[in-house]
Amino acid sequence: MMQPKKTKFRKAHKGRIHGVATSGATLSFGQFGLKAMAPERITARQIEAARRALTRHMKRAGRVWIRIFPDLPVSKKPAEVRMGSGKGTPELWVARVKPGRVIFEIDGVNVQVAKEALTLAAAKLPIKTRFVARIAE
């Protein structure tokens, strides 16, 4: 699972996801990609599940780039604990994803395989996505 090796602070504020992605909105590495269409927090487990679905369908051919990283800790209090007495312990790591952000990029496979693989990966994510392809140069 993806998580930072070291952080400045153990816990973070919840925050909000405003606006659209300006950086990471275009394909940089691969020929095909999966682009987010809505703001959402995506967990490290969801990223890993999508990556596995992607590589399995591609039969380990080609190359995959993960363009997001879960760097935000989400804390949770144990079950049946009264309110108060501080914030809970960090439970999982999430990535804040803005609309327009490219989540995955792939290369080395044909359009049909790429579309099917990215559709399978999209099913593992809690967000509406779109298949994008680099314009032939």
Curated annotation (Swiss-Prot):
Q: Does the keyword Cytoplasm apply?
A: no
Give an example GO cellular component term for this record: cytosolic large ribosomal subunit
Recall the GO molecular function terms of this protein's record: rRNA binding; structural constituent of ribosome; tRNA binding
KW RNA-binding (keyword) present: yes
- Which range is the signal sequence, renumbered to this chain? none
The UniProt entry, under Gene3D superfamilies, shows: Ribosomal protein L10e/L16
Enumerate the Gene Ontology biological process terms.
translation
Q: Which InterPro entries match?
A: Ribosomal_uL16, Ribosomal_uL16_bact-type, Ribosomal_uL16_CS, Ribosomal_uL16_dom, Ribosomal_uL16_sf
Which is an annotated Pfam family here? Ribosomal_L16
SUPFAM superfamilies from the UniProt entry? Ribosomal protein L16p/L10e
Print the keywords alphabetically.
Ribonucleoprotein, Ribosomal protein, RNA-binding, rRNA-binding, tRNA-binding
Assigned protein family = Belongs to the universal ribosomal protein uL16 family.
* Record's function text: Binds 23S rRNA and is also seen to make contacts with the A and possibly P site tRNAs.
- Assembly and oligomerization: Part of the 50S ribosomal subunit.
Q: What is this protein called?
A: Large ribosomal subunit protein uL16
